[in-house]
Curated annotation (Swiss-Prot):
This is Large ribosomal subunit protein uL14. Binds to 23S rRNA. Forms part of two intersubunit bridges in the 70S ribosome. GO terms for biological process: translation. NCBIfam families: rplN_bact.
């Protein structure tokens, strides 16, 4: 469950290392974001010569949460860290060209097939 002020890892090669959620998109007064939801983020820590820099405000999709996601068969997929993939504000396509770490199958149901195809492992 990601809410405002939550910090996440960037799971792509866009240049960001740590980001902070500043808004959960999708409805007025929506409090939490789960896997597959789009959030508004600001870059808190970035690497030199990356595509994004510290202070940039962008959209991102949540790909891993500590809370996890419950499957239809009753199993729960949880991760050690919260992570997101940075998106272009207008097209909502990934900024990076590589995805690090696993992503869940729930992203396949939404419009993020590009992220699923770039990911090294889909759980």
């Amino acid at each position: 469950m990601i809410q405002m002020q939550s910090t996440l890892d960037a799971a792509d090669n866009s240049g960001a290392r740590r980001v902070m959620c500043i808004k959960v998109l999708g409805g007025s007064h929506r409090r939490y974001a789960h896997i597959g939801d789009i959030i508004k983020i600001t870059v808190k820590e970035a690497i030199p010569r990356g595509k994004v820099k510290k202070g940039d405000v962008l959209k991102a999709v949540v790909v891993r949460t500590r809370k996890g996601v419950r499957r239809q068969d009753g199993s729960v997929i949880r991760f050690d860290r919260n992570a997101c993939v940075l998106l272009n504000d207008t097209t909502e396509q990934p900024i990076g060209t590589r995805i690090f770490g696993p992503v869940t199958r729930e992203l396949r149901n939404t419009k993020f097939m590009k992220i699923v195809s770039l990911a090294p492992e889909v759980l």
